[in-house]
Each structure stands twice: as C-alpha cells, then as structure tokens.
C-alpha cells in the first residue's frame, strides 16, 4: 500500500477536533521508511518538507492514539491474509540495543540480537502471514521488574 493510499485510509485516526495531522503522519512514515537511521534528524533529511521538531512533536506530544491505528491494521491484515490454509499468527520477540537508560523498558537483560545480556529494550510482536506475505498486527513492550516497581 503506497503512503498516499495508507493515509487516505488511516488519515482520520490522526485528526482531532481542532487539528488534522494526516500530512505529518504521512511524512513521518516516509521518513521511517526512507532514512537509514530511525532518528528524527535522519528522517528530516530524506523527506520533502521534513522537520525534525515536527516529527518529534507528532510522535511525543500529538493527542492521537495509536491503539485504533493498530486495531485497524489488524483488521485489514486479517481481511487480506487470514482465513487461508497457509495463514498463521507468528509471535516472536525482538530486542533493541540502547546506550542510555531513559527509554521506557531499557535494562540490562537478555538481548537476542546480540546473543548476550546487554542494555536494551525487548518487545513481543504478533505478525500475521499467509505464507507469502506478512503484516505486523500488534506489539507489546516488555517491562522489566524495576520499571514496574519504579516507573
């Protein structure tokens, strides 16, 4: 699905009573897809009218909720990929190496990507496949005990 088609279908999720952030959502997705690093600065260099501060605000402060977007993606994936003899739901974890300690869920824990204990975040992903195509349909960030006890 092209970015324009995606925003046409999902743009309503990025609107509030007073603001329409669909265009910013589209630029953010383009930046994530095109930049070599998933940083706001890198995204701003590869997207026309890209602005690091605007990306930061959209992700961190905009009042849109991600849950309805994820739910709609799940419904669309089920319609396209589900209900076939080859359909399957894959549940797997992935880890993200981190240098600092300020990202939610960061701790010294098993990092599958490195094959050792290191500073990272861990998330569990659900991916729907029909054997040829696949779509992520949900994810949950694992929170180590220290994050639960002292958020």
Walk through the language-model features, giving the residues of each:
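Conserved, well-structured functional cores that handle cations and Mg-NTP chemistry
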Residues: 1-151
